[in-house]
Amino acid sequence: MKFLGKLILWLLVALLLVIIGAWFLLQTHWGARQASAWLSNGTGWQVSFDEMEHDFSSPLHVQLRNVTFGREGKPATLVAKTVDIGFSTRQFSDPLHADEIVLNDGTLNLSPHSADLPFAADRLMLRNMAFNSPETGWALSAQRVTGGVSPWTPEAGNVLGKTAQIQMSAGSMTLNGVEASNVLIQGKIDQGEVTLSTLGADVARGTLTGNAKRSADGSWRVDNLQLNEIRLQSPASLAEFFAPLTTVPSLQIGRLDITDARLQGPDWAVTDLDLSLRNLTLSHGGWQSEDGTLSMNASEFIYGSLHFFDPILNAEFSPQGIALRQFTSRWEGGMVRTSGNWLRAGNALVLDDTAFAGLEYTLPANWKQLWMTPLPAWLQSLTLK
């Protein structure tokens, strides 16, 4: 029995020495190469790192240096200077679900094809990372990203998972061609519904703040959005500029405020624009509202041959149509003023009060052709009282 006991003891000591030796070997360049090859072999993924570090003061954390990870034969999904992985007792039941993954100083490229990653974490932390998400409908690229996702359970078609809390900041970001800097995002994802409880950024030399919610079907509800001192030049015509609003199934605007904006396109421009819009829903090329309002004024508005100075517009929206409470502007050396109603039934515009004073207007050479041009679909009749 003594011999058997000593044999078991020596076997345990030998096993412990092998484990300790393997542990130290893994922290060498040779060991890192061997571990990378073992992790990549037959998995469909390509993993490489130069060195693994472990500190007994943090026994449940392992740090990998100069990490590259991605599908075999595809561009790398992750390139990072360091990756810190925190473990917990959960590894006994779910070895690929970490307590925490911290990515430092690198680039994370996520697409629907790479989203079905073989691991997850209670927390994913990004520190000074670049983030690219092509082919997802968002066309997102961000630099100097710091923040986190909790929990992080990626799956095919859902880069961040179906349920998560999000808090991130970015030094710069491009989303669907729109550039921004000093971006702050806080919110959550819940079964395809995205809630942005805090949204802030510097955009087009101005600032953007607000909150919004995106439904699983792609509809948006903007509870509050403020744009201040925007300076934007666009290559798009006015119709093309607003075209993205028609691509979503529904856009519900609770409150939109624009202050001191200057916008310019190839055949249109507006300067010193102040706008306040309340309770309006855009859907399928139309609009709906129960008690919406619009107040707008500017120093100058240009659209084609039309050139208005100091235009002021106040209107109210209802299921029956639009009540034009006030429209005044300086135009062609004079003044124009009107009020009335646009009626949804029959697409009829009824002007109650219209006045022109001091105009100096020359008809264009093709005025007869313009006169014979059919009215747009939303304006089937015009009545002056």
What are these regions (language model features)?
Residues Q91, S111-D116, A212, G340:
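Short, T/G/N/S-enriched strand-turn elements that build extracellular solenoid repeat scaffolds
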Residues M1-L17:
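N-terminal Sec-pathway targeting helices
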Residues I19-P112, L175-A180:
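Terminal hydrophobic membrane-targeting helix
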Residues T107-T153, A164:
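Non-cytosolic head/periplasmic domains of membrane-anchored proteins
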Residues N132-V145, Q264-S283:
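Short, solvent-exposed loop/hinge segments that bridge or flank secondary-structure elements
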Residues H61, N66-T68, R123-A130, L160-Q264, ...:
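Small-residue helix/turn framework positions
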